[in-house]
Amino acid sequence: PIAITHANPAFWHPALRNKSGDVLKALGESGGMLGFSLYPHHLKDKSDCTVGSFCDMVARTADLMGVDHIGLGSDLCQDQPNSVVEWMRVGRWTKGIDYGEGSASDAGFPPMPPWFGGNLDFGNITDGLKAHGFDDADVEKVMGGNWLRFFKESFGPLN
């Protein structure tokens, strides 16, 4: 199965990396996984995105794909200098710079939303999912359980 490791639905925010409802529906139907990106350029309202908006998007995507096919794919580059993003943007064959959702005038890392400044803030997402009606079992799936199952089923022994 296919994994889209860090993107969001285009119905929520039309970033270049984000995927259409048709792609996400097919991904879920085929047993694939979507990892929700927390990179500000992929978020509705970017650095001003709220945890409520993010968790509402997760709930809408669960309705579209099924809760067993979604998880977090944070795309977190915590405490990295701008030289890291500069290195990532250089084309390996073209040697041209691809700014993706950024621009030449604003080429560095955008600030993270206040509710997710780093890996110590995953609990804010857990709390947000519960506030949006996810039960404990589904929160556990979204927060990592689905990825563990997907990896086990997709990369386990062949015999």
Where do the PLM segments sit?
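Flexible loop/turn segments at secondary-structure boundaries
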Residues: 10-12, 41-45, 78-81, 148-151
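Short, electropositive alpha-helical surface patch
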Residues: 1, 5, 50-63, 87-100, ...
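A conserved active-site cap/scaffold subdomain adjacent to cofactor or substrate pockets
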Residues: 28-48
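Short acidic/histidine-rich active-site segments
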Residues: 38, 65-115
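Mid-to-C-terminal alpha-helical segments outside catalytic/metal-binding sites
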Residues: 107-159
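Histidine/acidic residue-rich metal-binding segments in metalloenzymes
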Residues: 1-3, 16-32, 52-68
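Active-site glycine- and acidic-residue-rich loops that bind
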Residues: 8-18, 42-56
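Conserved, mostly hydrophobic/aromatic
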Residues: 34, 75, 139
